[in-house]
């Protein structure tokens, strides 16, 4: 059998076929490129050189090249994942629970309106962690949660401040994709609680904003409700139009408090 570059290309593609890898063939230069779908990092193989080796070593030449490419791509993938950070992201409870049928995302309950998902972020690529990716990473769900919360605490924060009718509003909007994630930083919430004199209200209307408010009167509640609705409507990744009263580590949706107030008011009038 006479070996050609085209036959060698077909042989290598057959041996290196994996769902996470792509092939590109330049017939003019007789080069086969094998690359990772996610990162686009890869290896170029000059086919005439492999054919020349095949003329001498036959099957062994193909095995050596396939092994070299496979090991190099796996090493690249490990290097990329070791440089990547796992971070939590806040999503609405209506957000999909599966990447595709039979492949659920790794999730944690947060509030009645929000759920925590986990992202593998290597600066260039961003992917929510599902069960299949979890297996590739060689981590447990608990390890992912612990790593994510640790990394969330390292996110910087600097608030802009505005006061309306005696109520003070603090805005975080760095646009790093993790503004809403800061709601999981317990030490940040506690430090804000210490400087707030009224009710501490927290809102994550969309992915790129965290609002913390010092509410001292009913006008403040009206303002935060309108503000949250406006941000929710404008966000690229909307989360919830509701805001929450934060107390002792718990988040109570405002509409529940409003209902309770109405019941109390009704009893007093009766």
UniProtKB/Swiss-Prot annotation:
Pfam families: DUF1444
Matching NCBIfam families: PRK13668.1 (NF010189)
Entry similarity comment: Belongs to the UPF0354 family.
UniProt-recorded name of the protein: UPF0354 protein BCAH187_A4826
Organism (species): Bacillus cereus (strain AH187)
């Amino acid at each position: 059998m006479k070996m050609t570059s085209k036959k060698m290309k077909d042989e290598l593609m057959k041996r290196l076929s994996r769902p996470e890898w792509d092939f590109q063939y330049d017939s003019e230069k007789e080069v086969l490129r094998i690359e990772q779908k996610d990162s686009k990092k890869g290896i170029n193989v000059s086919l005439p050189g492999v054919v020349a080796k095949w003329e001498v070593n036959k099957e062994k030449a193909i095995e050596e090249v396939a092994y070299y490419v496979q090991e190099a791509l796996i090493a690249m993938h490990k290097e990329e994942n070791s440089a990547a950070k796992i971070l939590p992201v806040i999503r609405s409870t209506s957000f999909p629970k599966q990447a595709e049928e039979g492949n659920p995302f790794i999730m944690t309950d947060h509030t009645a309106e929000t759920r925590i998902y986990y992202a593998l972020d290597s600066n260039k690529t961003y992917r929510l962690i599902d069960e299949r990716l979890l297996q590739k990473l060689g981590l447990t769900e608990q390890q992912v949660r612990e790593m994510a919360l640790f990394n969330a605490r390292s996110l910087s924060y600097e608030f802009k401040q505005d006061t309306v009718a005696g109520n003070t509003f603090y805005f975080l909007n760095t646009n790093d994709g993790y503004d809403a994630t800061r709601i999981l930083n317990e030490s940040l919430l506690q430090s804000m609680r210490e400087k707030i004199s009224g009710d501490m209200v927290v809102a994550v209307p969309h992915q790129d904003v965290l609002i913390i408010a010092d509410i001292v009167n009913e006008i403040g509640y009206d303002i935060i409700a309108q503000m949250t609705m406006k941000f929710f409507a404008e966000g690229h990744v909307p989360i919830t139009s509701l805001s929450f009263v934060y107390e002792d580590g718990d988040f109570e949706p405002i509409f529940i408090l409003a209902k309770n107030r109405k019941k109390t008011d009704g009893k007093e009038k009766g």
